[in-house]
Amino acid sequence: GITHFDLANNYGNPYNGSAEENFGRILDRGMREFRDELCISTKAGYEMWDGPYGDRNGSRKYLIASLDQSLRRMKLDYVDIFYHHVFDPDTPLEETAHALDQIVRQGKALYVGISNYNAEQTERMQQLLTELGTPFIANQPSYSMLNRQVEKDGLDQYAVAHGIGLAVFSPLSQGFLTDRYLNGIPTDSRVGRGNTWLGEQLNEELVSKLQQLNTLAERRGQTLSQMALSWCLHNPAVVTVLAGASKKQQIIDNCLLYTSPSPRDRSVS
Protein backbone atom coordinates (compact mmCIF):
# COMPACT_ATOMS: atom_id res chain seq x y z
CA GLY A 1 0.00 0.00 0.00
CA ILE A 2 0.89 3.69 -0.12
CA THR A 3 2.37 4.79 3.18
CA HIS A 4 4.41 7.88 2.24
CA PHE A 5 2.61 11.23 1.98
CA ASP A 6 4.60 14.31 0.97
CA LEU A 7 3.31 17.83 1.57
CA ALA A 8 4.57 21.40 1.95
CA ASN A 9 3.38 24.46 3.80
CA ASN A 10 2.61 26.30 0.54
CA TYR A 11 0.75 23.45 -1.18
CA GLY A 12 -2.95 23.80 -1.82
CA ASN A 13 -5.69 25.54 -3.69
CA PRO A 14 -7.28 28.02 -3.14
CA TYR A 15 -4.76 29.06 -0.47
CA ASN A 16 -1.38 28.09 0.95
CA GLY A 17 -1.70 25.46 3.64
CA SER A 18 -4.99 24.00 2.42
CA ALA A 19 -3.31 20.75 1.32
CA GLU A 20 -2.08 20.14 4.86
CA GLU A 21 -5.53 20.96 6.24
CA ASN A 22 -7.12 18.49 3.82
CA PHE A 23 -4.58 15.84 4.77
CA GLY A 24 -5.40 16.38 8.44
CA ARG A 25 -9.07 15.76 7.66
CA ILE A 26 -8.18 12.61 5.73
CA LEU A 27 -6.21 11.33 8.71
CA ASP A 28 -9.33 11.86 10.83
CA ARG A 29 -11.32 9.52 8.59
CA GLY A 30 -9.69 6.42 10.03
CA MET A 31 -6.03 6.80 9.09
CA ARG A 32 -4.79 8.48 12.25
CA GLU A 33 -4.74 5.17 14.14
CA PHE A 34 -2.09 3.98 11.66
CA ARG A 35 0.21 6.97 12.27
CA ASP A 36 3.14 4.77 13.28
CA GLU A 37 2.96 2.99 9.91
CA LEU A 38 2.93 6.20 7.87
CA CYS A 39 5.81 8.33 6.61
CA ILE A 40 4.59 11.92 6.52
CA SER A 41 6.84 14.68 5.24
CA THR A 42 6.40 18.40 4.77
CA LYS A 43 8.53 21.30 3.61
CA ALA A 44 9.03 25.03 4.09
CA GLY A 45 11.12 27.57 2.22
CA TYR A 46 8.96 29.35 -0.34
CA GLU A 47 6.78 32.41 0.26
CA MET A 48 4.01 31.52 2.69
CA TRP A 49 2.53 34.60 4.36
CA ASP A 50 2.73 38.39 4.15
CA GLY A 51 5.53 40.09 6.01
CA PRO A 52 9.33 39.95 6.14
CA TYR A 53 9.51 36.50 7.74
CA GLY A 54 6.92 34.84 5.52
CA ASP A 55 8.86 35.35 2.31
CA ARG A 56 11.12 32.75 0.67
CA ASN A 57 13.94 32.08 3.13
CA GLY A 58 15.81 29.57 5.23
CA SER A 59 15.98 31.43 8.53
CA ARG A 60 15.53 29.76 11.89
CA LYS A 61 12.49 31.96 12.63
CA TYR A 62 10.73 31.09 9.38
CA LEU A 63 11.46 27.35 9.41
CA ILE A 64 10.43 26.73 13.01
CA ALA A 65 7.30 28.89 12.73
CA SER A 66 6.38 27.19 9.45
CA LEU A 67 6.67 23.69 10.86
CA ASP A 68 4.65 24.64 13.95
CA GLN A 69 1.89 25.89 11.64
CA SER A 70 2.07 22.73 9.51
CA LEU A 71 1.75 20.49 12.56
CA ARG A 72 -1.33 22.41 13.68
CA ARG A 73 -2.94 22.14 10.24
CA MET A 74 -2.38 18.37 10.11
CA LYS A 75 -3.07 17.90 13.85
CA LEU A 76 0.21 16.03 14.32
CA ASP A 77 2.85 16.03 17.04
CA TYR A 78 5.68 15.43 14.57
CA VAL A 79 6.50 14.67 10.94
CA ASP A 80 8.81 11.92 9.81
CA ILE A 81 10.82 14.15 7.47
CA PHE A 82 11.04 17.94 7.39
CA TYR A 83 12.64 19.49 4.29
CA HIS A 84 14.04 22.93 3.65
CA HIS A 85 12.17 23.46 0.40
CA VAL A 86 14.62 25.58 -1.61
CA PHE A 87 18.18 26.86 -1.21
CA ASP A 88 18.24 30.41 0.13
CA PRO A 89 21.30 32.44 -0.94
CA ASP A 90 20.39 35.24 1.49
CA THR A 91 20.53 33.14 4.67
CA PRO A 92 23.79 31.62 5.94
CA LEU A 93 23.61 27.87 5.41
CA GLU A 94 24.83 27.46 8.98
CA GLU A 95 21.63 29.10 10.26
CA THR A 96 19.44 26.82 8.16
CA ALA A 97 21.36 23.77 9.36
CA HIS A 98 21.03 24.80 13.02
CA ALA A 99 17.29 25.34 12.55
CA LEU A 100 16.89 21.84 11.09
CA ASP A 101 18.94 20.40 13.93
CA GLN A 102 16.83 22.21 16.53
CA ILE A 103 13.63 20.89 14.94
CA VAL A 104 14.82 17.30 15.36
CA ARG A 105 16.01 17.86 18.92
CA GLN A 106 12.63 19.35 19.81
CA GLY A 107 10.94 16.18 18.58
CA LYS A 108 9.06 17.91 15.77
CA ALA A 109 10.70 15.79 13.05
CA LEU A 110 12.48 12.45 13.07
CA TYR A 111 14.70 13.25 10.08
CA VAL A 112 15.50 16.26 7.92
CA GLY A 113 16.09 16.78 4.24
CA ILE A 114 16.53 19.47 1.61
CA SER A 115 14.86 20.17 -1.71
CA ASN A 116 15.99 21.95 -4.86
CA TYR A 117 19.63 21.97 -3.70
CA ASN A 118 22.30 21.18 -6.30
CA ALA A 119 25.21 18.82 -5.65
CA GLU A 120 27.56 21.50 -4.30
CA GLN A 121 24.92 22.92 -1.95
CA THR A 122 23.99 19.41 -0.81
CA GLU A 123 27.59 18.60 0.04
CA ARG A 124 27.94 21.73 2.15
CA MET A 125 24.67 21.09 3.99
CA GLN A 126 25.65 17.50 4.68
CA GLN A 127 28.95 18.64 6.16
CA LEU A 128 27.17 21.03 8.51
CA LEU A 129 24.51 18.55 9.60
CA THR A 130 27.08 15.79 10.10
CA GLU A 131 29.01 18.08 12.45
CA LEU A 132 25.79 18.72 14.38
CA GLY A 133 24.85 15.04 14.47
CA THR A 134 21.54 15.70 12.71
CA PRO A 135 19.85 12.77 10.89
CA PHE A 136 19.96 14.11 7.31
CA ILE A 137 18.59 11.50 4.92
CA ALA A 138 17.16 12.97 1.72
CA ASN A 139 17.22 15.53 -1.05
CA GLN A 140 14.10 16.20 -3.09
CA PRO A 141 14.99 17.30 -6.64
CA SER A 142 13.00 17.41 -9.86
CA TYR A 143 13.88 14.42 -12.06
CA SER A 144 12.25 12.77 -15.05
CA MET A 145 12.89 11.46 -18.55
CA LEU A 146 12.49 15.06 -19.71
CA ASN A 147 14.58 16.67 -16.96
CA ARG A 148 17.94 15.01 -16.27
CA GLN A 149 19.65 17.88 -14.46
CA VAL A 150 20.23 15.56 -11.49
CA GLU A 151 22.58 13.52 -13.68
CA LYS A 152 24.27 16.51 -15.34
CA ASP A 153 24.96 18.08 -11.95
CA GLY A 154 26.26 14.83 -10.46
CA LEU A 155 23.75 15.00 -7.60
CA ASP A 156 22.73 11.37 -8.07
CA GLN A 157 26.34 10.18 -7.91
CA TYR A 158 27.00 12.26 -4.80
CA ALA A 159 23.86 10.90 -3.14
CA VAL A 160 24.85 7.28 -3.73
CA ALA A 161 28.40 7.87 -2.51
CA HIS A 162 27.28 9.61 0.69
CA GLY A 163 24.18 7.69 1.71
CA ILE A 164 21.54 10.29 0.82
CA GLY A 165 18.30 9.20 -0.84
CA LEU A 166 16.73 11.17 -3.66
CA ALA A 167 12.95 11.51 -3.30
CA VAL A 168 12.25 12.89 -6.75
CA PHE A 169 9.32 15.15 -7.63
CA SER A 170 7.72 15.72 -11.03
CA PRO A 171 8.68 12.23 -12.29
CA LEU A 172 5.83 12.58 -14.80
CA SER A 173 7.01 16.06 -15.83
CA GLN A 174 3.85 17.93 -14.83
CA GLY A 175 1.68 15.34 -16.59
CA PHE A 176 3.50 15.34 -19.93
CA LEU A 177 4.74 11.77 -19.37
CA THR A 178 1.20 10.38 -19.33
CA ASP A 179 -1.38 9.74 -22.04
CA ARG A 180 -2.94 13.17 -21.47
CA TYR A 181 -1.28 15.03 -24.34
CA LEU A 182 -0.66 12.32 -26.93
CA ASN A 183 -3.62 13.33 -29.10
CA GLY A 184 -4.40 16.93 -28.35
CA ILE A 185 -5.05 19.01 -25.24
CA PRO A 186 -7.89 17.84 -22.95
CA THR A 187 -10.02 20.69 -21.62
CA ASP A 188 -9.65 19.41 -18.05
CA SER A 189 -5.83 19.27 -18.22
CA ARG A 190 -3.48 21.89 -16.80
CA VAL A 191 -2.68 23.17 -20.29
CA GLY A 192 -6.37 23.09 -21.22
CA ARG A 193 -7.20 25.20 -18.16
CA GLY A 194 -4.76 27.88 -19.32
CA ASN A 195 -1.41 27.09 -17.70
CA THR A 196 0.73 29.31 -19.93
CA TRP A 197 4.10 28.00 -18.68
CA LEU A 198 3.20 24.39 -19.52
CA GLY A 199 1.46 25.38 -22.73
CA GLU A 200 4.61 27.03 -24.06
CA GLN A 201 6.51 23.76 -23.60
CA LEU A 202 3.95 21.58 -25.38
CA ASN A 203 5.23 22.03 -28.92
CA GLU A 204 5.29 19.62 -31.87
CA GLU A 205 8.76 18.36 -30.97
CA LEU A 206 7.70 17.41 -27.44
CA VAL A 207 4.47 15.74 -28.63
CA SER A 208 6.47 13.67 -31.13
CA LYS A 209 8.88 12.62 -28.39
CA LEU A 210 6.00 11.66 -26.09
CA GLN A 211 4.38 9.58 -28.82
CA GLN A 212 7.65 7.71 -29.42
CA LEU A 213 8.02 7.06 -25.70
CA ASN A 214 4.43 5.85 -25.53
CA THR A 215 5.12 3.36 -28.32
CA LEU A 216 8.10 2.04 -26.35
CA ALA A 217 5.96 1.76 -23.21
CA GLU A 218 3.32 -0.25 -25.08
CA ARG A 219 6.01 -2.68 -26.24
CA ARG A 220 6.96 -3.13 -22.60
CA GLY A 221 3.36 -3.77 -21.56
CA GLN A 222 3.22 -0.52 -19.61
CA THR A 223 1.50 2.83 -19.78
CA LEU A 224 3.70 5.83 -20.47
CA SER A 225 3.38 6.99 -16.86
CA GLN A 226 4.37 3.55 -15.53
CA MET A 227 7.45 3.50 -17.76
CA ALA A 228 8.37 7.04 -16.71
CA LEU A 229 8.25 6.04 -13.04
CA SER A 230 10.25 2.88 -13.81
CA TRP A 231 12.86 5.00 -15.53
CA CYS A 232 13.31 7.17 -12.45
CA LEU A 233 13.51 4.17 -10.14
CA HIS A 234 16.24 2.55 -12.23
CA ASN A 235 18.63 5.20 -10.89
CA PRO A 236 20.19 3.73 -7.71
CA ALA A 237 20.14 7.16 -6.05
CA VAL A 238 16.34 7.35 -6.24
CA VAL A 239 14.59 5.91 -3.18
CA THR A 240 11.05 7.03 -4.03
CA VAL A 241 9.07 8.96 -6.62
CA LEU A 242 6.55 11.63 -5.62
CA ALA A 243 3.71 11.52 -8.12
CA GLY A 244 0.77 13.86 -7.79
CA ALA A 245 -2.68 12.98 -9.08
CA SER A 246 -5.94 14.79 -9.76
CA LYS A 247 -8.02 11.61 -10.13
CA LYS A 248 -8.24 8.36 -8.16
CA GLN A 249 -7.69 6.25 -11.28
CA GLN A 250 -4.33 7.93 -11.90
CA ILE A 251 -3.11 6.66 -8.53
CA ILE A 252 -4.38 3.14 -9.25
CA ASP A 253 -2.76 3.06 -12.70
CA ASN A 254 0.59 4.21 -11.32
CA CYS A 255 0.49 1.58 -8.56
CA LEU A 256 0.09 -1.09 -11.26
CA LEU A 257 3.72 -0.31 -12.07
CA TYR A 258 4.60 -3.10 -9.67
CA THR A 259 2.63 -5.69 -11.64
CA SER A 260 4.50 -4.88 -14.87
CA PRO A 261 8.24 -5.17 -15.68
CA SER A 262 10.51 -4.58 -12.70
CA PRO A 263 10.70 -0.88 -11.79
CA ARG A 264 14.46 -1.38 -11.57
CA ASP A 265 14.60 -2.72 -15.15
CA ARG A 266 17.40 -0.78 -16.84
CA SER A 267 16.17 -1.35 -20.40
CA VAL A 268 14.53 2.09 -20.37
CA SER A 269 17.68 3.95 -19.38
Q: Where are the model-predicted features located?
A:
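Active-site mouth loops of central-metabolism enzymes
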Residues: 50-61
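Short, acidic/polar
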Residues: 59-72
